[in-house]
Amino acid sequence: MSGRPRTTSFAESCKPVQQPSSFGSMKVSRDKDGSKVTTVVATPGQGPDRQQEVTYTDTKVIGNGSFGVVYQAKLCDTGELVAIKKVLQDKRFKNRELQIMRKLDHCNIVRLRYFFYSSGEKKDEVYLNLVLDYVPETVYRVARHYSRAKQALPIIYVKLYMYQLFRSLAYIHSFGICHRDIKPQNLLLDPETAVLKLCDFGSAKQLVRGEPNVSYICSRYYRAPELIFGATDYTSSIDVWSAGCVLAELLLGQPIFPGDSGVDQLVEIIKVLGTPTREQIREMNPNYTEFKFPQIKAHPWTKVFRARTPPEAIALCSRLLEYTPTSRLTPLDACAHSFFDELRDPNLKLPNGREFPALFNFTTQELSSNPSLSSILIPAHARNQAAVSTTSNTTSTSDSNTGERGSTNNAASASASNSS
């Protein structure tokens, strides 16, 4: 979609990265059916760095790009499918994607199961292999299916997908991590369960106030206006803009801002939002305040979308696609928006008859930006269920292996006890 070069995912380090002693110890054999079986020494994605042998088979390429190659494989011990992302590792740097993924543990983020290093064909070539959850579909492919059939994506799916995206953003933003490449292709989907998982942290970065960042980031259609203006001191609200573009695309059946170039991208945005005011330009990048833009009026949001588009969807979109970065909703505020109220109905099920995926198991980490929203985000039926679950499992809450999720998933039960 964009011809941009792949941004680096390497973080500077004062000394070369030390590879594990087991580096490159990859054994290939054949099973009784003649299938290729690969055994590697890998490190778990979370927890202590205790290396272990991991054996997989049925390897096939499912994606590639400037970043490297993605394979699908089957773990021999469990039969589970995984995705293995193989990227060239620069020995001078730590891999930023790996550092970030090892911190993350959330139901709406693809899980790093293991990682291992392997050698390449050339001398001194080192590859990092990330073993990830395999999820069969993407929002991009599902939306394209409906678009080609000249049908609108059912609004219940728009709500489910966007809500889970905002949950994942609330979680990573609570750590100061900005994804920087939110787009439908990076939103993995299980079509049976409607579970969404955010993937591809190759452009992600922990943003630090006062430290500059590259502005040529994010795929063009989803690029926030401050990035087009060349800002280098942007915040994680660029992810919120991108999410707003995804929401608009799911409602429209096509990208809302389909620019042919960086400049044309801004033209497409101005066609909808109108010309930014001097103050809005200052908020995006102070260096552009004297630049003269043609004065164009904003297009009414109700005319941007189809006639039957729910007013709450339009209202949410208008709060995400704001020129001023600080005026955009936070991901947690977005989750609490009335557009998602239907998801809080205890009697609702998926169109295929299945139960909804987990939507209310908020962690204290997720809620940290605005804990007062828990009364909206965790509906009464979920609070009651959490309270019952906590009562019956009081002896199991100290499991030392639960990490971030286990130790913080009691936000709902804490909210229940506070409300009783």
UniProtKB/Swiss-Prot annotation:
Q: What's the superkingdom here?
A: Eukaryota
* Extent of Low complexity compositional bias: 389-401, 409-420
Q: What is its EC number?
A: 2.7.11.26
The family database entries (SUPFAM superfamilies) matched by this protein are listed as: Protein kinase-like (PK-like)
Q: Where is this region: Disordered?
A: 1-50, 384-420
Q: Which GO terms describe its molecular function?
A: ATP binding; beta-catenin binding; protein serine/threonine kinase activity; tau-protein kinase activity
What happens upon changing residue 85 to R? Inhibits enzymatic activity. Induces duplication of the anterior dorsal axis
Locations of Polar residues compositional bias? 1-24
Q: Which residues form the signal peptide?
A: none
> Which residues are in the Protein kinase domain?
56-340
User: Mind telling me how this protein is modified after translation?
Assistant: Phosphorylated. Activated by phosphorylation at Tyr-216.
Tell me which residues bind ATP.
Answer: 62-70, 85
Alphabetic keyword roster: ATP-binding, Biological rhythms, Cell membrane, Cytoplasm, Developmental protein, Differentiation, Kinase, Membrane, Neurogenesis, Nucleotide-binding, Nucleus, Phosphoprotein, Serine/threonine-protein kinase, Transferase, Wnt signaling pathway
Per its record, how is this protein called by name? Glycogen synthase kinase-3 beta
Encoding gene per record: gsk3b
